[in-house]
């Protein structure tokens, strides 16, 4: 029987190549052109995107990226590369490639990198713990487009999500415990997930249920009372309703009600990025403290910590 050679493809959203208006514009154009992200009529969306959104948002977003940019690139790219390298060290006989839905390195370059290693089976791990059509679905779509152009197609194992994976929950719980040990136990642990339009959930995207699953399992692992753990949604865009409650509005309300000490974790982000380091760690800190809160701490993403890499290795083991 012929032995199968397996490769692993780590997939994430992507990032601009530089914290400049031009680079951000290229990235946002690709990102916001995906129907999985924005499914508005193209006749309405194209003029709005190209004539209003890209010219106005790109310079402002570039400044935000510049505020968190690292020596090796954007935080998402730096931590994603660290994850790829650490997993490759953990699994020395298995090629590991990194691909992004938008920007570089592309998913196509990652597939080609693995095929150049003569793999005939690829385990695809989208680094989105909670499934959504707008994230995991986008990886699936692009992978199908890539393989449709190939004469020979490798076997594919596609990991839909890992919202209640035991190792994932334990890694989150240990990260929370470390933060509590360092900063003291807060009045409230707030778990902020990236939002999606409410309409997507109404049409069948089970993302909110998967977020609730992670929240429930994490609270149980920590032994925390339900009233001391709250789930919210961040990063809304546009005018239509998104999943609620909104993170920023909730933090303002909690500060005004006299909640003194909050710690915030973003379980849906496998690596720190603009949305965690700038929006949550900085903008929302100002919202909470400005509303009367006394102490606010952001708990970093799992990034390339040993526990996170071990979780990835265990997760893909069943498919190798």
From Swiss-Prot:
Binding site for Fe cation: 194, 275
Keyword Phosphoprotein: no
Protein role: Catalyzes the ferrous insertion into protoporphyrin IX.
Any one cellular-component term (Gene Ontology): cytoplasm
Name this polypeptide is given: Ferrochelatase
Catalytic activity entry: heme b + 2 H(+) = protoporphyrin IX + Fe(2+)
Subcellular location(s) of the protein: Cytoplasm
Pathway(s) annotated for this protein in UniProt: Porphyrin-containing compound metabolism; protoheme biosynthesis; protoheme from protoporphyrin-IX: step 1/1
EC numbers: 4.98.1.1
NCBIfam families noted in UniProt: hemH
InterPro entries (UniProt xref): Ferrochelatase (IPR001015), Ferrochelatase_AS (IPR019772), Ferrochelatase_C (IPR033644), Ferrochelatase_N (IPR033659)
PANTHER family on file: FERROCHELATASE, FERROCHELATASE, MITOCHONDRIAL
Native source organism of the sequence: Escherichia coli O8 (strain IAI1)
A single BP term in Gene Ontology: heme biosynthetic process
Family: Belongs to the ferrochelatase family.
Molecular function terms from GO: ferrochelatase activity; metal ion binding
Major localization listed first in the record, in broad terms: cytoplasm
Keyword set, alphabetical order: Cytoplasm, Heme biosynthesis, Iron, Lyase, Metal-binding, Porphyrin biosynthesis
């Amino acid at each position: 029987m012929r032995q199968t050679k397996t490769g692993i493809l780590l997939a994430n959203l992507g990032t601009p190549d530089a914290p400049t208006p031009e680079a951000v514009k290229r990235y946002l154009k690709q990102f916001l052109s995906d129907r999985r992200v924005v499914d508005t009529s193209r006749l309405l969306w194209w003029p709005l995107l190209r004539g209003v959104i890209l010219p106005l948002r790109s310079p402002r977003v570039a400044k935000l990226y510049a505020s968190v940019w690292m020596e090796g690139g954007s935080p998402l790219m730096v931590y994603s590369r660290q994850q790829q390298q650490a997993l490759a060290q953990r699994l020395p006989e298995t090629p590991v490639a990194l691909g992004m839905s938008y920007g570089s390195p592309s998913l196509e370059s990652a597939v080609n990198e693995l095929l150049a290693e003569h793999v005939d089976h690829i385990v695809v791990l989208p680094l989105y713990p909670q499934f959504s059509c707008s994230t995991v679905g986008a990886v699936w779509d692009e992978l199908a487009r890539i393989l449709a152009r190939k004469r020979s197609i490798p076997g594919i194992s596609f990991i839909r999500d890992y919202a209640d994976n035991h190792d994932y929950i334990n890694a989150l719980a240990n990260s929370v415990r470390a933060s509590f040990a360092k900063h003291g136990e807060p009045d409230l642990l707030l778990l902020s997930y990236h939002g999606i339009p409410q309409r997507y959930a109404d049409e069948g995207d089970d993302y909110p249920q998967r977020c609730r699953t992670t929240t429930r399992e994490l609270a149980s692992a920590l032994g925390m009372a339900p009233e001391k753990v709250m789930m919210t949604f961040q990063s809304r865009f546009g005018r239509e309703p998104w999943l609620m409650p909104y993170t920023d509005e909730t933090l303002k309300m909690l500060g005004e009600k006299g909640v003194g000490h909050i710690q915030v974790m973003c379980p849906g982000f496998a690596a720190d990025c603009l949305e965690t380091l700038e929006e949550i760690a900085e903008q929302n800190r100002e919202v909470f403290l400005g509303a009367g809160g006394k102490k606010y701490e952001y708990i970093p993403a799992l990034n390339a910590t040993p526990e996170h890499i071990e979780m990835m290795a265990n997760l893909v083991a069943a498919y190798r």
